[in-house]
Design a protein with these regions (language model features):
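Acidic (Asp/Glu)-rich catalytic clusters
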Residues: 55-62, 107-121, 140-152, 184-189, ...
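Active-site beta-loop-alpha junctions enriched in small/polar residues
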Residues: 40-42, 71-72, 127-131, 157-160, ...
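Active-site gating/metal-coordination segments in enzymes
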Residues: 84-202
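Catalytic pocket-lining loop regions of alpha/beta-barrel enzymes
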Residues: 168-297, 348
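An N-terminally biased module of ancient metal coordination in phosphate/nucleic-acid-related enzymes
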Residues: 26-109, 115
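Mid-to-C-terminal alpha-helical segments outside catalytic/metal-binding sites
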Residues: 2-6, 10, 23, 27-37, ...
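Hydrophobic faces of well-ordered beta-strands that scaffold small-molecule active sites
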Residues: 35-39, 65-69, 122-127, 153-155, ...
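Acidic/histidine-rich helix-loop elements
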Residues: 39-51, 78-79, 165-172, 270-272, ...
């Protein structure tokens, strides 16, 4: 009888202990506000923060998972232009930007130094390629085969970007460049997910002048097997919404030809345009509510030094989260990320297994 009571009490103790662990884990998950679909670990002079600091201090218990990429462009410090004043941003100087490939190896080295549980929270992206170079796809393949098990996608890379595109040394990026087609063909082959920045319009549009919509649409339709995320909805610091933009997005979202295209709500500048007035915010909420599986959230922060900067961007969208409701907010901030990036991880690892010697 004594052994029976001992066994019963032991079973009860173990049950309560395990229940506490489950509750604690659930409570911990409840603290997570979002997965970050758009995050830069380094800036335009390739300075930033270490990945372990990012996971421990910036993500912490508020950000569950995150993409990780630097910036594929290095700002040149030309003594002839700025003298001893070293530029740290592309607007600090008239000197050009140039493509910088070492960023991929740096991120891979940082990632591989992390313990497994921290690696699982990150999705590194390949960005160190020149989008005008027919060899760009070869660079992406070379990075994958050199660092198998690390990367989930490519990007954020830019085609048309206010003030940046014109500063880059060499050829100007174009939506019709065969080099870009080779990149997306390789993404389709491997399962790499891609994040592309392409402004929806010119910085200072003129009446009756074409914007970048048609060229972008044609590019997307040429690559139905590549999963593509359109960064910032095509908006920017001064790239404002075009006329009937809501109608345009609804038409694209309803068209099966764009079923592989997703949209990220990222950057404080994007929040500014979406919450420009009550009407614009309500229209945005209506469209997202109608197509909740096609949107993701990201901060677009660049190497922040404290967690508050991550949460600041998230809370800029608070009025939107309230309008779309908890279920849609969960999909945009967490669910869609997990669906897309988990699938990409699986496909890329399978490709690596079949192709890396």
């Amino acid at each position: 009888m004594l052994n029976f009571f001992r066994s019963t009490y032991l079973s009860l103790f173990l049950f309560l202990a395990l229940s506490t662990l489950v509750i604690t884990k659930a409570q911990s998950n409840d603290k997570i506000l979002f997965h970050d679909s758009h995050f830069h670990i380094t800036n335009y002079i390739q300075e930033g923060i270490e990945l372990e600091f990012y996971v421990d201090s910036i993500m912490g218990d508020k950000v569950g998972r995150s993409t990780v990429f630097g910036l594929p462009l290095q700002q040149q410090w030309s003594y002839r232009v700025t003298g001893e004043a070293a530029p740290t941003y592309y607007l600090d100087t008239d000197a050009p930007l140039y493509y910088y490939s070492f960023c991929d190896a740096w991120i891979a080295a940082q990632y591989l130094s992390l313990p497994k549980e921290k690696q699982e929270r990150l999705d590194p992206m390949i960005i160190g390629f020149n989008v005008t170079d027919m060899y760009a796809a070869d660079h992406i393949k070379r990075v994958l085969t050199t660092f198998p098990g690390v990367f989930t996608g490519i990007g954020e890379f830019s085609i048309h970007k206010e003030f940046v595109s014109a500063k880059i040394s060499g050829d100007v990026a174009s939506l019709t460049d065969p080099a870009l087609d080779r990149i997306f063909d390789f993404c389709a082959e491997t399962g790499l997910i891609s994040i592309i920045h392409n402004d929806i319009d010119n910085p200072f549009p003129k009446p009756n002048k074409p914007n970048y919509v048609k060229g972008f649409q044609e590019l997307i339709k040429r690559h139905p097997d590549a999963i593509i995320i359109w960064a910032h909805l095509g908006l920017g610091r001064i790239i404002k919404p075009i006329e009937d933009m809501g109608t345009l997005f609804e038409e694209m979202l309803a068209d099966p030809a764009y079923n592989h295209l997703y949209f990220d709500l990222s950057w404080d500048e994007t929040a500014k345009w979406l919450d420009y007035n009550d009407k614009s915010l309500e229209n945005t909420a209506r469209i997202i509510g109608k197509y909740p599986d096609r949107f993701l959230f990201g901060t677009d922060n660049v190497a922040p030094d404290k967690q508050e900067k991550q949460l600041y961007v998230y809370h800029l969208y608070d009025r939107l989260w309230k309008l779309v409701g908890e279920e849609v907010t969960y999909k945009v901030c967490i669910g869609n990320y997990e669906k897309l990036f988990n699938d990409a991880r699986k496909k890329v690892r399978a490709w690596e297994k079949a192709n890396v010697k």
